[in-house]
C-alpha cells in the first residue's frame, strides 16, 4: 500500500525536552490536566477594564506573532488562545453584566445572553471540527481492472429541464471505468417521455417509479431495488462529473471495507446570488466553499463526514443494512450518513472537486433551498439527536451536533442585529457594563474569533461574509426554526430549480422584504441615537450608552443593507456559463489544414474564447474545427468563429449529434483537472473583507434607471421555493408598503415629539428660598446622614405654639452673659456648673427645621450620681423673614415638658442669645431636648413651602448646675460610678497597680480594662496608671491583698474578692478593689467581674468563684455579626430604633461590626433584604415618596414607598392572577464588599412627600405619620471567606484585626519592657480597652511577656508597646519591616531592590505606571515631644503571624496613638504599615513586604492570586495554552496515525 500522509503527521514535533516528557507513560494526561486547570483558572478571573485592556493587548500581540508563520501547531495555539479570550469574556458576561431593573430589561438581556451562549457554543464546535483537517489523498486502485467493483450511477430528477439533466448523464457515461462494470440510471420522478427517449438514445437506463412518496429518498430507494451494483454513485441532475471521478475515489472504498461513504465537494461553476448580485461578490469565495474546503475535511479527521446528497459513492451493503436512504426527514443525505455511522460504518472525504454543478440562480431560490436544509437538520436534531443513542464516538456526536445546531442561527442573528434598539427605543440597558469594559472584554473576544477563523478558513470564506449570508436568510428561518423544533414532522421536500434565465435585472422584494422592514426600524433607532447625541442634554453615562448603541446599530444596519443588496438580481441571458480553462487548441479548416493555434480562455456548452491571432479580416461567421488532445485522446469539435480581433477569437459549437455533444461535455466538464482551481482565492484579510462588504452596500444606491420594477424571470418559477414558508408575493408587497408607511409615520411622530421636547425647557427651576443669613454654623440638612444623636428623631411630644405661660425668652445682654460666668465662679464647692453647646450634646451641626421636618431633637444624659439644681437654655440662630409672629414659632420642650417659644421678627431674621430657664425637675437620667417648628396658621400649615424655615445654632448652650449625691457602693451598679451609660462621652478610669507591674497583675488589669471597653463601646476609655490611690475621685485598685497600699488598710480576704470601698482621701469617691491571696486569685477576681453570668450582688463585697471559660473560635466575637446565616435587623438594634415619625423622620441606623478580612469570589456582593411597610392614610404621596438605603455614607438604592408591579403586573391583577400590592414591601439589595469594613452602619432615610404640595394641611398629619423598617429585614454575609493581605493598619484601626480574630486574644501576646513605666502600662490598658470595645469580650487569653521571653510565644501575634529607652530589646521583632528605631529616630532602613521593583512593575503595571514619578518615602522622624509611631509587619518568629509595635519616647506619644485609634474621623487615615502621629497630624506609609493570612477553598485561590493582577492572568493563561497545545498536537497526530494504521491493518487482513 502506498504511504498515506496527513498534515498532522507532517507537523514538526515538540521540542526535544517536551517530546521526552510527553513520551513518559501518563505524562501527557498529567500535563494536559495541569494545563486545563491553568486555563480554567485564567478564564475564571475578571479584571477591571483598564487591567483587562493589558491582557487584551498582549493577547492580540501574541496572535500576530504566532499567526505570522502558519503551521498546524500555530493554528491549534490560536484556537486555544481564542478559547481563553472568549471564555474570559463569557465569565465576565455571566458574572458582571447581568443586572436587570425591570422585567423587560431582564427579558431582553436574557435573550441576548442566550444568543451569545449559542454563538460561543458554535465557535468552540467549529474549532473542534477544524482543529486537524485530515487532507486525505487518493489511493490507487488494484492494477487489474477485473478486480474493480461494479458501480450504479444514479441521476435523480423531478422537474428539471432535459437540457440540464443530459449534461450530467452524458458526463456520467464518460467516466473512465470498465463499461461492463458501470451503469448510468436516470431516476425520473417526473415520468416524462422525452427523458425515456433520451435514455434510450444515449445508452442510459431509465427508471420511473409509479408514485412519488418520500421525494428524492424514495426515488433512490426504488432504484436500489432495481439495480445490483456493488457501489452506488449519486449525482444531482445538474452535477456534471469529471472522467476521473471513480478512479480517484474508489481506491479508498476498495482498500477499506468499513467505509460506507466517500463524499467529494459540491463545486458550482455558476456564481451564487451573493457572487452575482453584490458588487464585491465576484472576488468572494462561494458560500459553500467553507463547508467543502474546511469543515468536511475536519469532519473526516473525526470519522464524521456527512453525506451531502450528490457527488458521493455509497457502499450498497451499508445502504441496505440501514434499510435504504432515510425518509423521516427532508434532508435524507445527512440522516442516511448518521444511520450508517450508528451501525459502525466509517465515512470518508476527498477534498478534490470531481463534478461541477449549477448554483441557485436567484436569491429567493437560494433561501428556499436553505429553508429545506434547516428544516431537515433540525428534524434530525429532534428525532435522532446525535448526542443520544448508541454507535457514535464523541467526535462524531459533536460534529453532527455542530452541523445541526448551526441551522439555529436565525433567532440569535436577529437578536444580535436588533439588540441596540432596546436602548435606543426603550431605554433598556441590557448589558450592565461601561463602554470601556465592553471594549476590554467584548472586542478582544470578537477579534480573536474573527482572526482565528480567518487563519483557519484562509481563502475558503472571507471574514464578515457569514454575517451577510445569515442575515439574508435569518428572518425567513425564524418561523421554520420554531415550528420544526416544536413539530418536527411538519414540512416537505422541495426541489430547488436550476438553470433559469433573467431577461433583465430587477429588485426581488419577496426575497428581502423582511430585511427592509428591519432596516427601516434600525435606521429609526440609529436616527434616535444620533439625535440624542447631537441635541439631547445627556450626562456622561447616558452619552456613552447612546454612542455605544448607535455604533452597534450602525454596524447592524450595514450588515442588513448588504443583505438587502443581494436582492438586486442582475441580468442573466446566457444559456451556458463560461468556465475558465487554459487548453492548447488548433483551429483548422474542413480539409484539416491548420489556420491558427491558440490557447483557450474559457469554455462553455455554447462555445469557447481562444487567445490567438486570426490571419485575416473576418467577414462573417466561418465554419471551422477546433482540435485538441485530452489525456491522449484527440477531440475534433465543429464550430463557427463569429468574432476575432485584439488577439482573441470567439467560437460557438455547431453540434449535430450526440457524439459531438459528448465530446464538448468531455472538453468542458470532463477534464480531470477541470475544477482544481476551485479554491484559488486570495487568503482572507479581515479588514479588506469588511471593506468589500461595505462597498457592496453601494449597489443598493445605483441610479434609479437601474432599478427595474418587479417582473417574473423567464424560467423557472419560484412557486415552491419556500413551500409553506413563503406567502403570495403580491401580499408581501402590500405588507411591505403598509409597513414602510407605518414606520415612516412613527419616525415622523418620534422626530416631531423629540423636537418639541428639545424646544421646551428641560427643567423648571424651583422657587428660590428666602435668603438665609450667611453663617458658618448653618449647614443644609443632608439627604442621607450617618446616625448620630443630633440627627435622631425627636420624641412624639408636640407642645403648642403657645404653651403655658407662653415664655418667649428674653435677649441676653452682654452684661448678663458676663453675669453667667461670674455666677458659675461663685457657686459653692458642692455644686458644679456644666456648659454644653448643642454640638457637645451630639448635634451634627446647626439644627434646621422646615415644614416637612418640623421636629428636631437632641438626646443627652445626666450622671445618676448627680442632681440638677438649676438649668438654663441659651439659644441663637435665625428664622426665615417670611415667617409671621402671629402664626409661626419654634417651641422647646425637655422630656415633653414645655420650656419656651421663639417667635420670628421678619425685620431681624437672626436672634439671640436668648435665655430660657428650665425647671430642674424636668431632668432625668436620659433626656431629650426637642425643637418643634410651626410653619403656618393655627391648625393649618403649609409643610411643603421651602421658604419657611428656622435654624438653631450649634453653638447654643445648655447650662446645668449639679450637686453630687451620696455614693451608693453596690457592685450591682457596676460599671457605675466609673461610667454612666446615660452620659455619652469619653470615659476615664484611673488604675492603681503595684509599681513592679507583675505580668499576672497586668493581665488581670487588662481583663478589667477590656470589660470597661465593652461597656463604653465606641465612646472610648482611658486608664491613667499610678501606684498610689488618688486624692480625689474614683479608681480601681488591683493587686494581691498583702501588697495593697498600707493607707488602704489591706482588707482580709479568703480568696478571690471584689470590694467597693471609700477613697481614704475623698469620702464621696469609691475605690473598686480587685484582689486575692495570690496573683492567680487576682486574675480570677477580675474574671468574676468580666465574665459574671448573673447580676453582681447588691453589696459592696463579693467573693469570686473560679470561672470556666470555653475556648473561643475564630471570628466569634460577640460584637461581630453572625456570618453563617442571614441576620435580622431586630437582632442588631431594638425595634424602636427602626421606627420614625413625620415626613422627614431622619436617618434610621443599624450599626454592626464584622471582621475586615472578608473576601468573596470575584467581589460578589453581600445580600440584604429590606422590608418595610408603606404607610397608611391619604395624606402621603407614596409613589413619589421613597426610602434611601446606604451603608457607611455610601448610597446604595432608593425604593418608592408604594409597591408597583408595572403594566404586566396590573394586567395580571386585573384578571385575578396576581395579588394586589400589599403594604409590606420586600426588596433584595446587593451590598458591595468595598463598602464594608470593621465598624459599619446601615443608613435608611425615609423621604416622604405629602399628597398635595402647596396646599394647607393639618399640622398634626406630619407628626402622626409613622415610617419604619421591619425587624425581620436581614443582611447576609455567609458567602464571605476570611483572607487578607497584610500589613494593613486600617484593619487594626477598625476592630483590632488580626488580634481580635480570637475574641479573648488567646492567639496574642503583649510584649512590654522588662521594667515598664506607668505610661507604657497605661498604653497597654488603653489598648486592651480598645480590644474589648471592638469584640465586646474580655481579653482573658492574652499573655504578657518581656522581649527576653518572646520565644515562649513565638506562635502568637505580638503587640509590642515600648519606649525609646527599651527599643533595642524589641528591634529583632521588627526585622521583617522596613523601619528601625535608633538614636530617638524612626528611619527607613530598606527599600525594595531594583529586581523587586521590576517584578512588582511587571506584576502590576498600571500601579507602576501611575507611581512612575513617585519615589519611595524615606521616613526619618524623631519620636520625641509627643510623637508616636505604630508599625505593623510579619512576625520573624512564625510566618503568617503579625507584629504590631507602638513606639514613642514618652507616654504622651503612646497616648496620642491610642486616642487616634478611638477617633472615627481619624480611622480612615490609618493605613499601610506605618502610622506616625504628632498631635492632630497623622501620616501613613507603606514600605514593608506584604504577606497573606487566612485560608480559602482551593477553587478560590486562582481568583485571590490573580485578582487585579493582569500579568499573572496572562502568565497562567498562556502557560495553560502552551501545555494544552503540546498535549493536543501530540494527541491529534497520534489519532490521525491510528486512523491510517487501521486502514493498513484492514488491507493486510484482506
Curated annotation (Swiss-Prot):
State what changing residue 333 to R does.
Loss of activity
Region: Disordered; residue ranges are: 708-731, 768-813
Q: What is the effect of changing residue 372 to A?
A: Loss of activity
Q: Where is this region: Cyclic di-GMP binding domain?
A: 742-1550
Transmembrane found in the keyword field: yes
TM annotation in the entry = 26-46, 47-67, 106-126, 398-418, 423-443, 468-488, 507-527, 547-567, 1513-1533
Entry's CDD domains? CESA_CelA_like
List the subcellular locations. Cell inner membrane
**Where along the chain is the active site annotated?**
189, 333
Pathway in which this enzyme or protein is active: Glycan metabolism; bacterial cellulose biosynthesis
Q: What is the effect of changing residue 369 to M?
A: Loss of activity
Spans annotated as Catalytic subdomain A = 147-240
Which reaction equation describes what this protein catalyses? [(1->4)-beta-D-glucosyl](n) + UDP-alpha-D-glucose = [(1->4)-beta-D-glucosyl](n+1) + UDP + H(+)
Q: Region (Catalytic) spans which residues?
A: 1-741
Q: Where does substrate bind?
A: 236, 238
A cellular component term, taken from the record's GO annotations: plasma membrane
Impact of changing residue 189 to Y on the protein?
A: Loss of activity
Q: What's the chief localization of this chain?
A: membrane
Q: How does it sit in the membrane?
A: Multi-pass membrane protein
Q: Which InterPro entries match?
A: Cell_synth_A, Cell_synth_B, Cell_synthase_bac, Glyco_trans_2-like, Glycosyltr_2/OpgH_subfam, Nucleotide-diphossugar_trans, PilZ_domain
The free-text domain note is: There are two conserved domains in the globular part of the catalytic subunit: the N-terminal domain (domain A) contains the conserved DXD motif and is possibly involved in catalysis and substrate binding. The C-terminal domain (domain B) contains the QXXRW motif and is present only in processive glycosyl transferases. It could be involved in the processivity function of the enzyme, possibly required for holding the growing glycan chain in the active site.
The role this protein plays is: Bifunctional protein comprised of a catalytic subunit and a regulatory subunit. The catalytic subunit of cellulose synthase polymerizes uridine 5'-diphosphate glucose to cellulose in a processive way. The thick cellulosic mats generated by this enzyme probably provide a specialized protective environment to the bacterium. The regulatory subunit binds bis-(3'-5') cyclic diguanylic acid (c-di-GMP).
Q: Which family does it belong to?
A: In the N-terminal section; belongs to the glycosyltransferase 2 family.
Q: Tell me the protein's name.
A: Cellulose synthase 1
Q: What is the lineage of its organism?
A: Bacteria, Pseudomonadati, Pseudomonadota, Alphaproteobacteria, Acetobacterales
